[in-house]
């Protein structure tokens, strides 16, 4: 399984191929060593979020 690490101001996000597809991440451009991308976000019911799903996961 391939894994990509994304560094955000609040921490590091580990993205697997499955998560990459689930989040509908698209790469927009490359600037030096950095990849500029877009993560599709959708509104979900807060009751669907469980603590076990959110371990060490940060978005900014």
From Swiss-Prot:
Pfam family, one: Chordopox_A35R
Record InterPro entries: Chordopox_A35R
Family statement: Belongs to the chordopoxvirinae A35 protein family.
Other comments on record: Corresponds to the N-terminal region of the vaccinia protein A35.
Protein name as catalogued: Truncated protein A35 homolog
Lineage: Viruses, Varidnaviria, Bamfordvirae, Nucleocytoviricota, Pokkesviricetes
Gene: A38R
């Amino acid at each position: 399984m391939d894994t990509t690490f994304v560094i955000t101001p609040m921490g590091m996000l580990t993205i697997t191929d499955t998560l990459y597809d689930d989040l509908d991440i698209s790469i927009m451009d490359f600037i030096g060593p950095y990849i500029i991308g877009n993560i599709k976000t959708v509104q979900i019911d807060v009751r669907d979020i469980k603590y076990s799903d959110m371990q060490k996961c940060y978005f900014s």
